[in-house]
Every structure is written in structure tokens, then in C-alpha cells.
């Protein structure tokens, strides 16, 4: 398979296994959910009745007409413990390497089919210039939420895009399924395409 490089007559030859794969919604959904869950802190915590600070002395006599109560740390009292207290836990889900790579290939293939994958020769930014980056993206017609993927991390490119809330910049090593799925258009350099292919093929 050959993909056209935007702004030139050149083409880049790519593997059908990476950029021509069938889309599996179930697989992509599973990998995206697992990726997002791995980013959850899972640090919420509440105290049970045994962990709440307070006296455990019986609050009132057993007899006398009122309801029977023991410690004031019981869940029915204000300031008491929580009945089924939340505890810190990990939301991490296991995803096999083969599964993850297959999902990434499926996403890239679907982006290509939908015309949302724009390949450029390079995306060099010599100096930090947000206005210049906006003009460059406008010329490519990439929509509101573009994802720029380069072979190596570029500090000038990152700093130029930092103040643009809907523009994301990734190098190949930092590419993830959530960023790909959420982008209107993925702008990727020809060198990055080759590196992605080496990683996923």
C-alpha cells in the first residue's frame, strides 16, 4: 500500500498489516478503556466504624424507652464510620502486547480510510512560535483537534503547541490509542510513519 505525502508528489510505501487492517470496535474499545483505567489514581478512602476516632462507650442505657445504641462511631450517626467504606485500589486491566498493537493498527487503518491521516515530509519548527504553528495547521486543514506525530520529540514544536488547548503533540514513543481516537486529524511525518510501522508490524 502507498500513501500520498501531502504537499508533494511523493508517496510512502506502508504495510497493509498496519495501515490496511480491518477495524474491530470491540478490540479498540477494550484497549481504550484499559488505557484510561490505568491512568486512574484509585486513591479514594473512607473509614469504617472501627477506624473512626471516637469513644466506643455505649452512648445511652440499654433500657429506658429509646432506641438501643452502642458506640457513636456506628454508621447511623453523623461523624460515624461508613458502612461499605471505599479503599484505595488499582483499576489496571491486563492487555496483551499483541492485543495493544492490533488495536493501534486498527485505529490507524480506520483513520486512513476516513481520510483523517495526513502525512507530511516533515514538521520542523525552528523557533517557538504559536502563530506560525496555527498558520501551518490551517494550511493543512486538520480540523479543531489535530494530533501531530513526529519521529523524535521537538521542544520548539511542543512549546509552540502548548498554549493551544486542542492541539496535541506526540513523538512515536509517546503515541497512545486515546490520543489517536480523540483526534480529528492525525498529522504524521513520513519518518514517523516508518518508525510506527517498525514498532507495530
From Swiss-Prot:
Q: Where do transmembrane segments lie in this chain?
A: none
Q: What is this protein called?
A: Large ribosomal subunit protein uL4
Q: Does the keyword Nuclease apply?
A: no
| Family membership noted in the UniProt record | Belongs to the universal ribosomal protein uL4 family.
- Pfam families in the record, alphabetically? Ribosomal_L4
Which PANTHER family would you find in this protein's record? 50S RIBOSOMAL PROTEIN L4, LARGE RIBOSOMAL SUBUNIT PROTEIN UL4M
Q: Which organism is it from?
A: Stenotrophomonas maltophilia (strain K279a)
Biological process terms in GO annotation: translation
Q: Which UniProt keywords apply?
A: Ribonucleoprotein, Ribosomal protein, RNA-binding, rRNA-binding
**What's the stated role of this polypeptide?**
One of the primary rRNA binding proteins, this protein initially binds near the 5'-end of the 23S rRNA. It is important during the early stages of 50S assembly. It makes multiple contacts with different domains of the 23S rRNA in the assembled 50S subunit and ribosome. Forms part of the polypeptide exit tunnel.
The UniProt subunit note reads as follows: Part of the 50S ribosomal subunit.
**InterPro entries, alphabetically?**
Ribosomal_uL4 (IPR002136), Ribosomal_uL4-like (IPR013005), Ribosomal_uL4_dom_sf (IPR023574)
GO: which molecular function terms? Answer: rRNA binding; structural constituent of ribosome
Q: Name one GO cellular component term.
A: ribosome
Tell me yes or no: is Manganese among this UniProt entry's keywords.
Answer: no
Region annotated Disordered sits at 43-69
